[in-house]
């Protein structure tokens, strides 16, 4: 991990098109601004983790639902024969 020290108003550039700027330094918080193209997803880590967990849960449910649908489809096909 690269650790840098910056003052209010100073920036860090990530590649050619992403800039992270220190906006304010408070007692227990640091406010940063991120300038990035709209094609780049910028999320707080806790939001990213929540989305990741929801995706895992929904993919598990989809497999189960797909298996149930396949079973129903197979039963229906046998009845039609």
Curated annotation (Swiss-Prot):
GO terms for molecular function: mRNA 5'-UTR binding. Its main location: cytoplasm. Gene3D superfamilies: Translational regulator CsrA (2.60.40.4380). It comes from the Bacteria. It is found in: Cytoplasm. Keywords: Bacterial flagellum biogenesis, Cytoplasm, Repressor, RNA-binding, Translation regulation. Homodimer; the beta-strands of each monomer intercalate to form a hydrophobic core, while the alpha-helices form wings that extend away from the core. A translational regulator that binds mRNA to regulate translation initiation and/or mRNA stability. Usually binds in the 5'-UTR at or near the Shine-Dalgarno sequence preventing ribosome-binding, thus repressing translation. Its main target seems to be the major flagellin gene, while its function is anatagonized by FliW. Belongs to the CsrA/RsmA family. This is Translational regulator CsrA. It comes from Desulforapulum autotrophicum (strain ATCC 43914 / DSM 3382 / VKM B-1955 / HRM2). The gene is csrA.
């Amino acid at each position: 991990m690269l650790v840098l020290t910056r003052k209010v108003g100073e920036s860090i550039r990530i590649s050619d098109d992403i800039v992270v700027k220190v906006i304010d330094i408070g007692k227990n918080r640091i406010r940063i601004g991120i300038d990035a193209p709209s094609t780049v997803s910028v999320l707080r880590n806790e939001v990213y983790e929540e989305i990741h967990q929801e995706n895992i849960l929904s993919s598990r449910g989809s497999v189960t639902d797909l298996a149930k649908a396949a079973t129903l489809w197979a039963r229906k096909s046998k009845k039609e024969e």
